[in-house]
């Protein structure tokens, strides 16, 4: 915590001005009342972003802990310009499109047993919103069990979802760590019993969607790092400035929505972790102000919980979006049931009908749809009590700062919280190599195996080669084909083996010809010995050329290395 910082519950952040006795009087909201959250709604271009910018800039310059999640990018870049020199080292600038210096962010890192279902619920609701066309009950069921299992295994990331489905050795290793009996039963009894046909039908949709993120280096280099390079709880407790630039135009809408949703979940978990502190320690912790513009892009199942519980852990939310139908009914209920201050710019007819219950009888639906640029109606939390609705105008943008340390801020953040792209990609490649199929299996030496392929390791090949050399030197009379793959150093053994096979085949053919010439004598001989005729083994790869064995075919059969 900044030793010079002192929390002032009466500190006001200004955002509007109203007429009082023929004078234009600026007003704002006190720090203590901000803990009841602020909800901003209005059509695009009405001034919502400017309102949020003005509040965040004041927080930054007042030494507060701030997180601003911006889906457009313009506000995030503007905030960098207003960071004073004294706070340059306080900034964590998260711009995923800065592919040369990616931060590490693992949403699955260090999640306690009692928080795992919250993380999974948040991820599942995000996936469902992003993959609405491909979502199914079966996909949800399997993916949920994948995530719950991976959360129990140390060092896993979202990239491991596909590895869990296709790498049997990795899957078995993860299941060994699972302690949740329901999750373990799914993998041991249910998934293990799936037929190949069913598995091929059930899992490709998940692999395809997760694979889209895994194949994009912009996202992969962030979410595939096992350890996050920043600590959100530490940010909250030490009043850091966390600026998140999720410009959809530069990184894609789905990528921005996924990262924003995961960040929101982790911020909530970080705030919840304050519950583990003593009452005395919690009372001394500073507040943390979270701004989310176009919040419907990052909303997930945990958002309703954030609105209802965050105040207890000194997490204040200021959220903005364009119209009510962008969020589900349960989120709407959480907003109007928990938010203390509601600010509306001009809205459409549907939103006006919903909001009139808040503003009538002072303002009616037709008033809400006719507001001008920067004009607002609001009900404000004042000393813990909601005010009557009143009208105002938002303040103009904050004047340009007399300083501009934006470049230094970005450079300092890179040096502290990012890693060079080459280093990150090498680390991810090493992890992939370590966890590749067979990575968890000990090398086996199966002497009964007759077929060898190019995927077998060299040590097994050398063992078989040595075995065949010894067999050849000892004059083994067996007529079965050699199993080994001979190298250049084994040419002598190869010649002996070829000669032995040639003699063997010639001898057998000679015996067969002799038997044909004297069939009666041949049969009598067999009856006396009471042994069935010994069949001549003929391998599919062997050929006859005028009674001689093709040396080329034998070499091909023995897989000779030239």
Predicted regions and their residues:
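Conserved ATP-driven motor cores of ASCE-family P-loop NTPases powering translocation/secretion/packaging/pilus
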Residues: 83, 111-117, 306-389
């Amino acid at each position: 915590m900044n030793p010079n910082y002192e929390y002032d519950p009466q500190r006001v952040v200004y955002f509007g001005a109203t007429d009082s006795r023929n004078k234009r009087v600026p007003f704002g909201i006190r720090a203590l009342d901000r803990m009841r959250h602020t909800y901003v709604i209005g059509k695009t271009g009405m001034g919502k972003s400017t309102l949020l910018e003005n509040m965040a800039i004041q927080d930054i310059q007042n030494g507060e802990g701030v997180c601003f999640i911006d889906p457009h990018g313009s506000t995030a870049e503007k905030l960098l310009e207003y960071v004073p020199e004294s706070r340059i080292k306080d900034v964590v600038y998260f711009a995923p499109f800065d592919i040369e210096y990616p931060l590490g962010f693992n949403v699955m890192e260090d999640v306690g047993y009692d928080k795992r279902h919250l993380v999974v619920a948040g991820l599942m609701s995000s996936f469902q919103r992003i993959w609405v066309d491909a979502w199914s009950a079966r996909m949800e069921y399997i993916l949920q069990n994948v995530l719950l299992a991976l959360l129990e295994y140390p060092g896993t990331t979202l990239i491991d979802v596909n590895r869990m489905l296709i790498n049997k050795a990795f899957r078995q290793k993860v299941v060994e760590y699972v302690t949740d009996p329901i999750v373990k039963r799914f993998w041991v009894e249910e998934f293990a019993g799936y037929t190949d046909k069913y598995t091929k039908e059930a899992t490709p949709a998940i692999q395809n969607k997760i694979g889209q993120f895994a194949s994009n280096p912009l996202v992969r280099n962030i979410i595939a790092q096992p350890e996050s390079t920043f600590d959100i709880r530490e940010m909250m407790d030490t009043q850091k400035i966390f600026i998140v630039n999720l410009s959809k135009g530069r990184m894609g809408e789905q990528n921005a929505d996924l990262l924003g949703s995961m960040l929101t979940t982790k911020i909530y978990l970080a705030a919840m972790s304050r519950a583990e502190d003593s009452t005395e320690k919690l009372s001394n912790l500073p507040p943390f102000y979270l701004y989310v513009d176009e919040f419907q892009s990052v909303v997930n199942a945990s958002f309703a919980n954030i609105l209802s519980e965050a105040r207890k852990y000194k997490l204040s939310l200021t959220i903005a979006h364009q119209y009510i139908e962008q969020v589900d009914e349960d989120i709407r209920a959480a907003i109007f049931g928990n938010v203390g201050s509601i600010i509306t710019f001009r809205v459409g007819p549907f939103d006006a009908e919903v909001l009139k219950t808040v503003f009538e009888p002072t303002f009616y639906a037709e008033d809400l749809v006719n507001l001008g640029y920067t004009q607002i109606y609001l009900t404000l939390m004042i000393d813990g009590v909601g005010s009557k609705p009143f009208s105002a105008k938002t303040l103009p943008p904050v004047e340009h700062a007399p300083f501009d340390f934006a470049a230094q801020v970005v450079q300092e953040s890179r040096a502290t919280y990012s890693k060079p792209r080459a280093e990150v990609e090498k680390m991810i490649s090493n992890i992939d190599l370590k966890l590749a199929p067979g990575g968890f299996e000990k090398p086996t030496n199966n002497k009964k195996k007759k077929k060898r392929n190019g995927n077998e390791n060299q040590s097994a090949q050398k063992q078989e080669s040595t075995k065949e050399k010894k067999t050849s030197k000892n004059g083994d009379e067996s007529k079965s084909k050699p199993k080994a793959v001979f190298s250049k150093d084994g040419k002598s053994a190869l010649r002996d083996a070829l000669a032995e096979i040639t003699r063997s085949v010639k001898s057998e053919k000679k015996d067969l010809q002799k038997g044909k010439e004297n069939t009666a004598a041949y049969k009598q001989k067999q009856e006396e010995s009471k042994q069935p005729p010994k069949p001549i083994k003929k391998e599919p790869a062997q050929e006859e050329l005028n009674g001689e064995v093709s040396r080329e075919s034998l070499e091909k059969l023995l897989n000779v290395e030239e």
